């Protein structure tokens, strides 16, 4: 019996050449709507779906393949006598190949002017039903949903006259991944439209971007996936201009650096190591900002990741060229800067559209046996809600330093303390199990620069001991959430030493 293929695609990439190859193998082709029209326009002889179903395409194409003659031909088990007998009695013929991809729902809802009606109209019904039927019966049916697989199938047909069982199984698995991702997009879209923030089930879908050499350590396997609607201002959508392939750790660090530099509207440069900032500087131009970020910690920046929120010019590139760095991220690089930096063959250069998110996206964190979902911490300092419980208020310069430290401290692993002075960080204490321990690290790093600096703490002071350490170091202004039952003790210490202290009412833990 002559083999048959059913071809109905939204993405018509390569379909004419593929169908031509099927016809050359003596395979009869059934097609629908726009696909049939395209194939016939290219001189290929195909059978209309209505000739198989005996029923016209109706309701603007909503009903065309939902018919027993189609699904009987797909689902019949060819070595089951009962199935074969029923097919013969009902005049059905088997379908051996299904070439289908689905209505472009993702592309439709990505349009800024999409209406709800447009989105609904682009939910495919017949397509998923066909490919699921074919995939279930993959022992007898080859189902192709991705143009990438056209050449593989044709090559096996030409060489062996059939598609290998292992290939059919792989294609079937791809179908169910495809429909699961498709349904996830639809369910998430409808859930968002209804304003449901915590549905009873959560299905997420990501698209493979690249295999990585290894994970956090060489013995760990890793892959990088991107969200289907990831912000263009993200590592997932970065353009790599130069250098080695990004590693797992590179991607994590680049993401951390990008998150911090987005906090600033003025020219700013961030240096990151192990997802913590080691130096942050702002200035009148990007060269000045980089100089301050470097001077913040000229030791830790070695082998680090740099993110800038302005174009890298030649002068800045020459300074960057002086030390070993893993990555430099910027909105753009001047041609002269590229020529300087590309002389380092392994240095990764990334361009990213750097803009702060206008709304909080969801952050997913896996734990053993589950998944935590929360909003990203995008909250900025609101000066209308702060309070100043101390006798002295911050000076204009202290306010400037406090704001810089506060922008940075929310991105430092808790317990977090950041010291800032004169448009740059001068000390970062990260990840200690007690707050005073982080303060001591930041103060030690700052050294004599701590005198007259500002301190930011990501959470309140449970004891006044951190304030005592700050006072001994000559720190003159502090910003913290407040809210401890011992706030009065801290306020008394601050007043004793003439320290200005600001309560924000907002905590910025980061684990």
Curated annotation (Swiss-Prot):
MF terms in GO: IMP cyclohydrolase activity; phosphoribosylaminoimidazolecarboxamide formyltransferase activity
Pathway field: Purine metabolism; IMP biosynthesis via de novo pathway; 5-formamido-1-(5-phospho-D-ribosyl)imidazole-4-carboxamide from 5-amino-1-(5-phospho-D-ribosyl)imidazole-4-carboxamide (10-formyl THF route): step 1/1; Purine metabolism; IMP biosynthesis via de novo pathway; IMP from 5-formamido-1-(5-phospho-D-ribosyl)imidazole-4-carboxamide: step 1/1
GO cellular component terms given for this protein: cytosol
InterPro entries noted in UniProt: AICAR_Tfase_dup_dom_sf (IPR024051), Cytidine_deaminase-like (IPR016193), MGS-like_dom (IPR011607), MGS-like_dom_sf (IPR036914), PurH-like (IPR002695)
Keyword terms: Hydrolase, Multifunctional enzyme, Purine biosynthesis, Transferase
EC code(s) of this entry: 2.1.2.3, 3.5.4.10
Keyword Nucleus: no
Record carries keyword Secreted: no
Domain of life according to the entry: Bacteria
Gene Ontology biological process terms from the UniProt entry: 'de novo' IMP biosynthetic process
Reactions catalysed: (6R)-10-formyltetrahydrofolate + 5-amino-1-(5-phospho-beta-D-ribosyl)imidazole-4-carboxamide = 5-formamido-1-(5-phospho-D-ribosyl)imidazole-4-carboxamide + (6S)-5,6,7,8-tetrahydrofolate; IMP + H2O = 5-formamido-1-(5-phospho-D-ribosyl)imidazole-4-carboxamide
MGS-like domain residues: 1-145
SUPFAM superfamilies for the chain: Cytidine deaminase-like, Methylglyoxal synthase-like
Pfam families in UniProt: AICARFT_IMPCHas, MGS
Record note on domains: The IMP cyclohydrolase activity resides in the N-terminal region.
Family, similarity comment: Belongs to the PurH family.
HAMAP family registered for this protein in UniProt: PurH
Name of the protein in question: Bifunctional purine biosynthesis protein PurH
Source organism phylogeny: Bacteria, Bacillati, Bacillota, Bacilli, Bacillales
